[in-house]
């Protein structure tokens, strides 16, 4: 299935460059539930268990020979889109923010659905984080 790219989405895709990416990101912090010691692993498993639904399964098709369209992804790699990482021992919130800044810097791969998630374990104060990057 394919569908026309809405004008606002198309504007962001056309304006984007390596020097000026136009994706957005969100960092969410959570307290670990006291009675769920494996909650982070459970979340990672859940995220990797489901294929994305529209619009998160679309890939932009920007050819000069036809109207720009979103094409449904033929394949989906849950490991690529849903990462599980842990901060090193004794990390601080500043370390978390540096990590997220580094993750945010690169453009999303336009040959794959335009989102990535990082579930980040070992955040200070017995927390975990979710960093979401979308176009």
Language model: regions and residue ranges:
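Non-catalytic N-terminal regions of enzymes
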Residues: 1-135
């Amino acid at each position: 299935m394919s569908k026309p790219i809405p004008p606002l989405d198309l504007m962001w895709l056309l304006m984007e460059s390596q020097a000026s990416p136009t994706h957005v990101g969100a960092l969410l912090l959570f307290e670990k539930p006291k009675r769920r010691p494996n909650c982070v692993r459970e979340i990672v498993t859940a995220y990797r268990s489901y294929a994305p639904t529209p619009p998160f399964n679309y890939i932009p098709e920007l050819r000069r020979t036809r109207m720009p369209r979103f094409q449904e992804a033929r394949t989906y790699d849950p490991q690529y889109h849903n990462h599980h990482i842990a901060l090193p021992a004794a990390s601080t919130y500043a370390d978390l923010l540096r990590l997220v800044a580094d993750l945010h810097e690169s453009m999303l791969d336009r040959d794959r659905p335009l989102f990535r998630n990082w579930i980040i374990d070992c955040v200070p104060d017995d927390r975990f984080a979710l960093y979401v990057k979308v176009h």
